[in-house]
Amino acid sequence: MKNNSVVLTESLSIPEKLSYFNEDDKNDYEILAKKFREKKIKHIVTVARGTSDCAALFVSYMFAKCLGITTYSLPPSLITLENANFDFNNTLVIIITQSGLSQDLIACESAVKAMGAETLVITNNLKSELINSGTYFYNINAGEERSVAATKTFVLTLAIIIKLMSTILLKKNVLINLLELPNLLQKEIDNNWDHEIIEKKISSGFIISRGIGFALSNEIALKFKELCQEQIEPYSSAEVMHGPKSLIDNTFKIFTLSLNDNSGSVVIKDTNEIKQKTKHLYEITSNSHLDTRLLFTKNKFSELDPLTIMTKFYPWIIKYSLAKGMDPDTPRYLSKVTKTF
């Protein structure tokens, strides 16, 4: 097994990177928070691809849930291929791009501003032209991410969104707990999941969740494809019941992710039904008695649980990839900057 994996090193650095981010954060959350409180922003539109699009799904659900704002994920092709026009007055378009170099996202940012939108650019690249063109800019500040597979930038993007939402809602206790979180994350990594409990011979299945957890399940599914060449598909546990559950048997492996919020109890209920259909079931949860449980320590504020889950997940999936004899530093056919338009 490879011992000097770049992506593993980066994933293990997440607690340290979050601590540094907290200490050095110069992002102006209050300027946007004030606009939201004054109801000057009526709609949220996100534009992103890959792992950043999984973060955008997190954005969409959180803003809709917490603020009652309509949210929409804009396919870049509507701008770059179809030349579609929209009325984006009173709309904040959030562009999330770790590299800051995707030409389709750069084109979208310019186009939506011409349609009346204000834009928030969230990137890890201080040399990106988007920094100067965006109405607002938030720095992910994760340090250089050398690996093809994004890890630390995803977690810090979620932290940015949680900080913005907590500032809007004046949840000072969440912000205080976020400052203390790196210590907990380090303990969680030091007591991480056992990758050896996963059935390596099965390469297809589902990752099932609801609510905010569904955004995480999309990123988890992407990493199974990217690093392990396994076709694990993300589903809402409700949508699974509308047809896909017909696929489930002992040739499938199922991961379920339940958070400590309103969605969690529903996922647990659906998990109990799925248990009867396959012996390859793995629960990502803070409370389970299964031998195949993947436990995380719940936070005082459930808003922070996604950071804990993903901080544990990344080193675990990378070690699983290595155990399968793969090289997670060089995912097949992939490169750091994907050129699409």
Model-flagged regions — what are they?
Residues K2-K42, Y136-I140, E144-K253, S263, ...:
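Active-site phosphate/pyrophosphate-binding segments
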Residues K2-L8, Y20, G134, A159, ...:
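Phosphate-moiety recognition in structured ligand-binding domains
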Residues T9, E16, E23, A56-L57, ...:
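A broad, structural surface signal
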Residues E30, R37-N183, D190-N191, R210, ...:
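Glycine-rich phosphate-binding loops that contact phosphosugars or nucleotide phosphates
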Residues A55, V59, L156-I161, L216, ...:
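Catalytic-loop motifs flanking and including active-site residues across diverse enzymes
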